[in-house]
């Protein structure tokens, strides 16, 4: 079977990801681009006698740029192999913006097939597009699709299998008359005949002209020293405008001509209902009300809608534990499988429905176009804290995970903005905290719904999200006033159209993220659960063909816990909670599996029950409950602020290029966590809430 590598390229919000999901389905994997940690999505399309490997490049408005993720597309296309081609995704409603990028790719001499999206919107708005004339103007093969419904995808797959579908085209636009004449004579003298060689020549000329947008000498270095000297001498004697801005102007002239000949807009693109929605969502007061209502709805749904699948998973794990218990004879293997592996890993798997709902909700906000509006709205608020709206997307991304959120700060050109965002991103409630929060909230805040509608647990979870935002903004202001004093950058963005999210695209997005969560967290949880099981059961002795394990208080882990208990008792924590805090430094969700293993070891031989029920039943020596609302609140606040994630600290070091900033991050967050938990628990005791 033949193989072909294809790069999927386009502007942000052009339908590129939806098209990628339509083509590849579940045949996807994620990784990183070589040399950087920007996420790379790859997928496979199987056609008769042909396997297409598609790489989804980061969405960008052009080639090159200051931010590192913007350079990725440029570097990949520049270093592509001869047989690698491009599918360029062009938004039919934003031709002017999309054609600027496409013309740059044509200049590079890359074989390209154009996919024109938004077919449904064209028809709905009665926009007339002359596809035949557009093909003729560009000299490329173009296929019109509806990426959401899949209309036109079969025609696209037919074209993908044909080599002639990917076409090279000579530069379509022209420089000014002096520059064009000079370039023509140079090409003749240097015997340049290919697109690629002409592209390198024009880049070298821009470099020699000291273009601020091009400070890379590698294009000039492609030529022999004699040629370099010749080019330098020629440019010194002639005042020519070889510059990026000039390119943009001359491309725009051609683009306006193409658009005027190929597309006709009988009605305004922006519909009145969209304008009315923007008046609400972007309103300085109503906009924030809508944002917090949406967040409140999310956290209510995490408990209301996920309860049934959570119970089913919990029952399934319990049933599996009981089956293994009936099949295997008593001994270390049985205990390891039931309490260590199933008890540890299963305790986190139970929370997958709620994590999936979180990813689904964020996906809906992003695909609908609301997330960009939330960024625009937050720019006003964040400006008061020394940040711009550019920081909002990475901060909101922290609701999934702080690691990609910190990597996402590469889109922020202002160094002070970027470093501040990196330092405060871990304060936003992430998906790793969800299993911890949900366990604590479900254990100590199991009250009837307010007014019979509003779930108390959902309200507490929303409060934790809101608290994380407020504290992150507060520390952003502190950092901007003390350490990163450079002026904040301006925030300019294009608001995408409102779209009805694609169910298929949402499914693939949620599936991929849940799979990634289980793959990364599950491996860590499995290893730590096995180690904890060993430490909580040993020392043990084998006597009369029977294994006799130590009581958990006298086991290795129990001894460590008892030593640290006096230090954490003022925070309201016992030794088991202390051990779970220690292990959760590897990954926050490990706290849940740690408690499951510790409590499972303590109650060996008893009937299996849910971890929440076990925690509620736990008593101190004086008969009072270990898990009270005050203890739960103290623990929630500790996990809200503590730097309990090695991966976050590692990526902070990588992105800042210094050990100083992850050290500062760890110290300020851990100090804040200990101080807040201590203050709340001690005040609660004084007020009689123990």
Curated annotation (Swiss-Prot):
<feature type="transmembrane region" description="Helical">
    <location>
        <begin position="670"/>
        <end position="690"/>
    </location>
</feature>
<feature type="binding site">
    <location>
        <begin position="10"/>
        <end position="17"/>
    </location>
    <ligand>
        <name>GTP</name>
    </ligand>
</feature>
<dbReference type="Pfam" id="PF02421">
    <property type="entry name" value="FeoB_N"/>
</dbReference>
<dbReference type="GO" id="GO:0015093">
    <property type="term" value="F:ferrous iron transmembrane transporter activity"/>
</dbReference>
<keyword id="KW-0812">Transmembrane</keyword>
<dbReference type="InterPro" id="IPR027417">
    <property type="entry name" value="P-loop_NTPase"/>
</dbReference>
<dbReference type="GO" id="GO:0005886">
    <property type="term" value="C:plasma membrane"/>
</dbReference>
<keyword id="KW-1133">Transmembrane helix</keyword>
<dbReference type="InterPro" id="IPR030389">
    <property type="entry name" value="G_FEOB_dom"/>
</dbReference>
<dbReference type="InterPro" id="IPR050860">
    <property type="entry name" value="FeoB_GTPase"/>
</dbReference>
<feature type="transmembrane region" description="Helical">
    <location>
        <begin position="434"/>
        <end position="454"/>
    </location>
</feature>
<keyword id="KW-0410">Iron transport</keyword>
<keyword id="KW-0997">Cell inner membrane</keyword>
<feature type="binding site">
    <location>
        <begin position="56"/>
        <end position="59"/>
    </location>
    <ligand>
        <name>GTP</name>
    </ligand>
</feature>
<keyword id="KW-0342">GTP-binding</keyword>
<dbReference type="Pfam" id="PF07664">
    <property type="entry name" value="FeoB_C"/>
</dbReference>
<feature type="transmembrane region" description="Helical">
    <location>
        <begin position="459"/>
        <end position="479"/>
    </location>
</feature>
<feature type="transmembrane region" description="Helical">
    <location>
        <begin position="387"/>
        <end position="407"/>
    </location>
</feature>
<comment type="function">
    <text>Probable transporter of a GTP-driven Fe(2+) uptake system.</text>
</comment>
<comment type="similarity">
    <text>Belongs to the TRAFAC class TrmE-Era-EngA-EngB-Septin-like GTPase superfamily. FeoB GTPase (TC 9.A.8) family.</text>
</comment>
<feature type="domain" description="FeoB-type G">
    <location>
        <begin position="3"/>
        <end position="166"/>
    </location>
</feature>
<keyword id="KW-0406">Ion transport</keyword>
<dbReference type="Pfam" id="PF07670">
    <property type="entry name" value="Gate"/>
</dbReference>
<keyword id="KW-0408">Iron</keyword>
<protein>
    <recommendedName>
        <fullName>Fe(2+) transporter FeoB</fullName>
    </recommendedName>
</protein>
<keyword id="KW-0547">Nucleotide-binding</keyword>
<dbReference type="InterPro" id="IPR006073">
    <property type="entry name" value="GTP-bd"/>
</dbReference>
<keyword id="KW-0472">Membrane</keyword>
<feature type="transmembrane region" description="Helical">
    <location>
        <begin position="345"/>
        <end position="365"/>
    </location>
</feature>
<dbReference type="GO" id="GO:0005525">
    <property type="term" value="F:GTP binding"/>
</dbReference>
<dbReference type="InterPro" id="IPR003373">
    <property type="entry name" value="Fe2_transport_prot-B"/>
</dbReference>
<dbReference type="InterPro" id="IPR011642">
    <property type="entry name" value="Gate_dom"/>
</dbReference>
<feature type="transmembrane region" description="Helical">
    <location>
        <begin position="623"/>
        <end position="643"/>
    </location>
</feature>
<feature type="binding site">
    <location>
        <begin position="35"/>
        <end position="40"/>
    </location>
    <ligand>
        <name>GTP</name>
    </ligand>
</feature>
<feature type="transmembrane region" description="Helical">
    <location>
        <begin position="280"/>
        <end position="300"/>
    </location>
</feature>
<keyword id="KW-1003">Cell membrane</keyword>
<keyword id="KW-0813">Transport</keyword>
<feature type="transmembrane region" description="Helical">
    <location>
        <begin position="516"/>
        <end position="536"/>
    </location>
</feature>
<dbReference type="InterPro" id="IPR011640">
    <property type="entry name" value="Fe2_transport_prot_B_C"/>
</dbReference>
């Amino acid at each position: 079977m033949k193989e072909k590598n294809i790069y999927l390229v386009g502007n942000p919000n052009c339908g590129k990801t939806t098209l990628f999901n339509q083509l590849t389905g579940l045949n996807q994997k994620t990784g990183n681009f070589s040399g950087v940690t920007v996420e790379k999505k790859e997928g496979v399309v199987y056609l008769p006698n042909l396997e297409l490997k598609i790489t989804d490049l980061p969405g960008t408005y052009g080639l090159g740029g200051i931010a590192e993720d913007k350079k990725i597309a440029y570097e990949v296309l520049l270093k592509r192999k001869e047989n690698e081609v491009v599918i360029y995704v062009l938004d039919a409603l934003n031709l002017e913006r999309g054609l600027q990028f496409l013309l740059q790719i044509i200049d590079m001499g890359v074989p390209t097939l154009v996919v024109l999206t938004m077919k449904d919107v064209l028809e709905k708005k009665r926009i007339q597009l002359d596809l035949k004339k557009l093909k003729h103007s560009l000299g490329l093969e173009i296929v019109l699709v509806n990426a959401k419904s899949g209309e036109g995808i079969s025609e696209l797959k037919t074209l993908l299998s044909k080599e002639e579908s990917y076409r090279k085209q000579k530069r379509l636009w022209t420089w000014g008359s002096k520059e064009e004449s000079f370039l023509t004579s140079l090409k003749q003298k240097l015997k340049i005949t290919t697109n690629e060689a002409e592209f390198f020549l024009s880049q070298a000329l821009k470099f020699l002209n000291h273009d601020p947008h091009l400070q890379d000498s590698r294009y000039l270095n492609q030529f022999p020293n004699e040629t370099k000297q010749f080019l330098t001498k020629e440019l010194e004697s002639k005042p020519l405008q070889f510059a990026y801005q000039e390119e943009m102007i001359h491309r725009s002239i051609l683009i306006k001509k193409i658009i005027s000949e190929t597309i006709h807009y009988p009605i305004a693109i922006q519909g009145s209902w969209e304008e009315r929605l923007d008046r609400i969502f972007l309103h300085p007061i109503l906009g924030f009300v809508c944002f917090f209502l949406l967040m409140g709805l999310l956290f209510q749904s995490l408990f209301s809608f996920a309860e049934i699948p959570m119970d089913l998973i919990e029952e399934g794990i319990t049933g599996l534990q009981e089956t293994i218990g009936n099949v295997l004879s008593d001994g270390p293997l049985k205990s390891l499988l039931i309490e260590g592996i199933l008890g540890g890993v299963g305790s986190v798997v139970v929370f997958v429905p709620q994590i999936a709902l979180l990813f689904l909700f964020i996906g809906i906000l992003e695909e609908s176009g609301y997330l960009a509006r939330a960024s625009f709205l937050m720019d006003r608020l964040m400006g008061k804290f020394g940040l711009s709206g550019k920081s909002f997307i990475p901060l909101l991304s922290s609701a999934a995970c702080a690691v990609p959120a910190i990597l996402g700060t590469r889109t922020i050109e202002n160094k002070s903005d970027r470093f501040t965002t990196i330092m405060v991103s871990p304060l936003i409630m992430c998906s790793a905290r969800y299993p911890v929060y949900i366990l604590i909230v479900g254990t100590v805040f199991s009250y009837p719904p307010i007014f019979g509608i509003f779930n108390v647990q959902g309200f507490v979870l929303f409060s934790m999200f809101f608290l994380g935002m407020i504290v992150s903004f507060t520390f952003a202001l502190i950092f901007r006033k003390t350490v990163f004093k450079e002026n904040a950058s301006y925030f300019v963005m294009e608001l995408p159209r409102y779209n009805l999210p694609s169910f298929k695209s949402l499914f693939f997005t949620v599936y991929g993220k849940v799979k990634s969560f289980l793959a990364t967290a599950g491996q860590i949880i499995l290893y730590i659960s096995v180690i904890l099981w060993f430490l909580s059961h040993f020392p043990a002795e084998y006597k009369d063909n029977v294994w006799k394990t130590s009581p958990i208080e006298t086991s290795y882990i129990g001894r460590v816990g008892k030593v640290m208990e006096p230090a954490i008792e003022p925070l309201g924590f016992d030794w088991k909670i202390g051990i779970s805090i220690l292990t959760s430094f590897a990954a926050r969700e490990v706290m849940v599996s740690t408690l499951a293993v510790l409590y499972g070891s303590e109650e060996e031989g008893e009937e299996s029950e849910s971890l929440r029920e076990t925690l509620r039943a736990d008593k101190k020596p004086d008969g009072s409950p270990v898990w009270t609302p005050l203890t739960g609140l103290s623990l929630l606040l500790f996990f809200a602020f503590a730097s309990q994630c090695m991966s976050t600290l590692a990526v902070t070091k990588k992105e800042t290029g210094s050990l100083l900033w992850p050290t500062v991050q760890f110290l300020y967050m851990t100090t804040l966590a200990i101080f807040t938990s201590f203050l709340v628990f001690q005040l609660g005791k004084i007020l009689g809430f123990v």
